[in-house]
């Protein structure tokens, strides 16, 4: 055991050094000042001991070790202290840490701990106004307590707005919502209940959707129940449900959910047809565009693998995504549609349009290079040699990107000597992920 202990300490120190590097990179994106440098070997040893004490739930012992060390060690130990739900960190400790360490990782967890401590200490009256001035409640209890405080202090519109936001976002529980309505005698309208049901169903939280049924009028009860049943794997009369839907967005969501159900049941072609029908009915809600695209992406690739290239292209190109609804989903959709058009359908003109869309929305060197390279391939396939070379040159202007390096190999006279041109590994034709 004695022989093993130095190795264990060395491994622990190595892991902690990695943690320090991660935090330093997040906190100091540029070179830090001397006072902000990483711990020395001696300080790292103290940090290892303090972390070991925390791991053993000896929070007081860890603090005692850290108090004798420079600020960087004290801060790292305190970071773990305020992040843990079992450390006994006080609200003042958490609040002070957040104020002094704005860019540290794990901030969301620390804020959650702060709210829990605020409520546990019954500090809403004295500390709530400052705490919630710069952040929204994260818990149901926090939503309720802060709304009640605002309502009691003649901030009724602010209280109602907060309750509405928490309710639709699924932060406020049904029990706490009922507590609010009993206290304030101000129930939310049915449109907010419907919005909450929509959020619950997009998050695949069927129980949360079902508990709202009693708060809705009969026609909307039927719609929410139908969609919940579909997500539970139960067959429903889709036409009747769509007829009762209050908006085109709800119609599209019902059809989309049925497409997912059919896919899970192994009815692939029926699923493709329904997904395309959903596309024709309404665009996806911006908040759930990524989920919408994930299903389209899966189905398009499944269709492509089955040799149904035309269907695959339709699923990728007709998803009705925009750069404003979800930039990540939009970029993925445009690339996949362009790739299928070029490689599988031999329609470079269509492909060029998608790669141009990709280029127009690109926000990073990697995406710019990718868009320019594939646009160049589409132009080359169309016989537009000069324009293709211009596009390859644009991609090569991003030499750190994979497609920038590939583009060098497509240029007859690259802007650097051949021996200096960076080499790409892998094949572009395989990269459709």
List PLM regions with ranges.
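Alpha-helical solenoid repeat scaffolds
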Residues: 35-433
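Bacterial N-terminal signal peptides
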Residues: 15-27
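Compositionally biased, low-complexity repeat tracts
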Residues: 9, 13-14, 30, 229, ...
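Signal peptide processing junction and immediate N-terminal pro/mature segment
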Residues: 27-36
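N-terminal secretory signal peptides that target proteins for export/translocation
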Residues: 1-11
């Amino acid at each position: 055991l004695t022989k093993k202990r130095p190795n264990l300490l060395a491994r622990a120190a190595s892991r902690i050094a990695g943690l320090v590097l991660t935090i330093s990179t997040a906190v100091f994106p540029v070179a830090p000042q001397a006072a902000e440098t990483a711990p020395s070997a001696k300080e790292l040893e103290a940090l290892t001991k303090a972390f070991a004490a925390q791991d053993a739930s000896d929070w007081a012992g860890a603090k005692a070790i850290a108090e004798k060390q420079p600020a960087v060690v004290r801060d790292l130990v305190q970071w773990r202290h305020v992040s843990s739900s079992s450390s006994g960190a006080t609200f003042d400790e958490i609040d002070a840490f957040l104020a002094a360490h704005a860019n540290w990782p794990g901030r969301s967890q620390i804020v959650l701990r702060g709210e829990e401590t605020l409520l546990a200490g019954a500090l809403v009256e004295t500390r709530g106004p400052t705490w919630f001035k710069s952040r929204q409640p994260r818990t149901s209890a926090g939503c309720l307590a802060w709304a009640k405080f605002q309502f009691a202090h003649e901030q009724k519109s602010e209280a109602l707005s907060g309750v509405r936001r928490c309710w639709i976002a699924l932060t406020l529980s049904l029990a706490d919502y009922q507590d609010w309505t009993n206290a304030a005698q101000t129930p939310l309208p049915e449109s907010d209940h419907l919005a909450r049901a929509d959020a619950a169903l997009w998050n695949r939280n069927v129980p949360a959707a079902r508990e709202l049924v009693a708060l809705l009028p009969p026609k909307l009860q039927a719609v929410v129940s139908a969609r919940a049943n579909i997500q539970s794997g139960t067959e429903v009369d889709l036409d009747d449900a769509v007829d009762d839907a209050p908006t085109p967005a709800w119609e599209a969501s019902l059809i989309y959910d049925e497409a997912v159900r059919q896919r899970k049941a192994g009815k692939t072609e029926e699923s493709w047809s329904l997904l395309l029908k959903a596309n024709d009915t309404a665009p996806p809600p911006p908040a759930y565009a990524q989920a919408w695209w994930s299903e389209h992406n899966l189905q398009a690739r499944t269709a492509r693998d089955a040799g149904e290239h035309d269907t695959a292209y339709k699923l990728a190109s007709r998803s009705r995504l925009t750069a404003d609804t979800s930039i990540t989903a939009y970029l993925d959709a445009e690339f996949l549609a362009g790739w299928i058009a070029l490689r599988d359908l031999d329609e470079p003109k269509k492909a060029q349009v998608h790669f141009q869309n990709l280029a127009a929305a690109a926000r990073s060197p990697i995406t710019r290079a990718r868009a320019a390279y594939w646009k160049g391939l589409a132009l080359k396939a169309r016989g537009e040699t000069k324009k293709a070379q211009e596009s390859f040159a644009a991609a090569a202007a991003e030499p750190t990107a994979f497609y920038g390096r590939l583009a060098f190999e497509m240029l007859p006279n690259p802007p650097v000597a051949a021996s200096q041109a960076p080499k790409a590994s892998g094949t572009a034709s395989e990269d459709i992920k």
